[in-house]
Design a protein with these regions (language model features):
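Hydrophobic faces of well-ordered beta-strands that scaffold small-molecule active sites
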Residues: 59-65, 88-90, 150-154, 197-199, ...
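Divalent metal-coordination and catalytic microenvironments
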Residues: 9, 29, 53, 64, ...
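Di-metal (Zn2+ and/or Mg2+/Mn2+) metal-binding site signature of metallo-dependent hydrolases
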Residues: 55-79
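Histidine-rich, glycine-flanked metal-binding segment
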Residues: 2-3, 10-59
Length: 256
């Protein structure tokens, strides 16, 4: 068993209580004791770290990242891992890389490049495309090791283009069959381990060529059907970037 003791830490524990000096003991990667400074025993410890008053905090959870491509090549997921982030959530803003027909790969790269200003050349060189469906994307991510925990959502942009083809990419209305199929794929994604679903309704989000993210112009009916699918599963986060135009935004009415 591996035992590590951090002594003389200026602890910020995340509960809202004031900082305090403390000793922290970990065993096999788990915190087992937080004690007053100077009181922790070090016998049997493989490592003793003197924090010397440095701040020590729990790992940060970054609920809004866009590592959807970077997970293909970067086990460190920088820069998050440089700044105390221990859990990152991706698949935000309606953009991502699954599900994906092979002929949509470059289009999805240019969509992400436009929305998030991530160099397309890096994504083209780095993504290995070992998937088509969203569950296969999760399998690809799960087959790799990272220095922090990650979770992802199924994004509206790739979902719409996967089901509807160019009609979906062009933000044309979905048919009843389209909506049903998108809802089925969201259910499938949640059952496979997706944290939820994301969409973007802001015209500020555009592809490299200036196209709006698929889903930007859809009405309530399409989003409600997806929300109903999530309700049938019984869990899942529904994340959206609001439209930023009308005040109050239409989405607030939908949430009632």
């Amino acid at each position: 068993m591996t035992r590590v003791v951090i002594k003389n830490a200026n602890l910020v524990d995340g509960t809202g209580t004031p900082t305090r000096m403390a000793d922290i003991t970990m065993q096999d990667g788990l915190f087992i004791e937080v004690a007053s400074s100077g009181s922790a025993g070090t016998m049997g410890a493989e490592r003793v770290i003197d924090a010397d008053g440095a701040l020590v905090t729990p790992g940060f959870v970054d609920v809004h990242t866009h590592y959807d491509a970077q997970v293909s090549w970067d086990p460190w997921l920088t820069p998050s891992s440089w700044h105390g982030v221990t859990t990152a959530v991706m698949g935000n803003c309606g953009v991502g890389f699954a599900p994906a027909h092979p002929d949509r790969h470059q289009w999805l790269i240019e969509l992400m490049e436009g929305v998030e200003d991530i160099p397309g050349s890096a994504m083209t060189d780095g993504i290995d495309w070992q998937w088509e469906s969203f569950p296969e994307y999760l399998d690809s991510v799960a087959s790799r090791s990272y220095v922090l925990d990650i979770g992802t959502q199924i994004a509206h942009g790739p979902l719409r283009a996967y089901v509807m083809g160019q009609r979906g990419a062009d933000n044309l209305p979905a048919t009843e069959d389209d909506r049903r199929r998108m809802a089925e794929l969201v259910e499938e994604a949640l059952r496979a381990g997706a944290l939820g679903f994301s969409t973007s309704r802001t015209p500020l989000h555009k592809s490299k060529s200036g196209e709006l993210v698929p889903g930007t112009m859809v009405g309530a009916e399409e989003l409600f059907e997806i929300a109903d699918a999530m309700a049938r599963i019984g869990h899942g986060n529904f994340q959206f970037s609001p439209e930023h135009i009308r005040v109050p935004n239409e989405e607030w009415v939908w949430m009632r």
